[in-house]
């Protein structure tokens, strides 16, 4: 039997409503350790039903991994910012890091992020947008923050921003230099 629930509470309720079911699989997209609903569901199972269930995580590929592979870019030096259901310092992240990956969602849509960058002096930052990644109608677009600010994008999108003009920070120390 297939249940289409997305809330951790409702997923656990659906499992518990079927006591004859000995094995259940809960499928989340992406990597279970990368901003996944698996974390909340596992915590809920531990709180409410630890004696009744044994959990196992089998991760998929995260949107970060997938998108960077499509772009042929390594991601070990990428700053990750989740704006999915939360706020973040968009301009600050881009000013301080050469590459920033944004998980979008809710009020933080791609065009809004690009507008924020443009309004904060980062109009020329290069923006890669991945829409509906891994679906047949997947689309990847590239432009500057300014050129993407008024475009329309699918709500199921991520973006990676490259900023060649990262703020240079000199280390400040107290006292005299060692010479």
In which residue ranges do the predicted regions lie?
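Short amphipathic alpha-helix with an adjacent loop that forms part of the alpha/beta core around
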Residues: 10-19, 90-94, 147-151
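Short, acidic/turn-prone active-site loops that include or flank metal/cofactor-
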Residues: 1-11, 61-63, 79-87, 105-107, ...
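A contiguous loop/helix-start segment that scaffolds small-molecule binding in enzyme catalytic cores
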Residues: 23-24, 96-179
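Short, glycine/charged-enriched secondary-structure capping and boundary segments
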Residues: 15-16, 39-43, 70-73, 115-117, ...
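Class I SAM-dependent methyltransferase SAM-binding "motif I" and its flanking Rossmann-like core
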Residues: 33-98, 150
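Class I S-adenosyl-L-methionine
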Residues: 1-55, 179
């Amino acid at each position: 039997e297939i249940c289409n629930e997305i809330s951790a509470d409702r997923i656990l309720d659906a499992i518990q409503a079927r006591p004859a079911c000995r094995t259940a699989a809960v499928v989340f997209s992406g990597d279970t350790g990368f901003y996944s609903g698996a974390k909340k569901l596992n915590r809920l199972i531990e709180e409410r039903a630890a004696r009744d269930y044994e959990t196992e995580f089998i991760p998929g590929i995260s949107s970060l991994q997938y998108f960077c592979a499509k772009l042929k870019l390594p991601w070990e030096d990428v700053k990750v910012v989740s704006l999915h259901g939360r706020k973040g310092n968009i301009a600050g992240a881009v000013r301080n890091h050469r590459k920033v990956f944004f998980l979008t969602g809710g009020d933080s849509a791609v065009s809004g992020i690009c507008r924020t960058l443009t309004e904060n002096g980062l109009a020329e930052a290069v923006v890669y947008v991945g829409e509906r990644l891994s679906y047949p109608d997947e689309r990847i677009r590239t432009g500057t923050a300014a050129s993407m600010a008024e475009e329309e994008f699918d709500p199921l999108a991520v973006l990676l921003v490259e900023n060649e003009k990262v703020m240079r920070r000199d280390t400040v120390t107290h006292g005299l230099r060692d010479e």
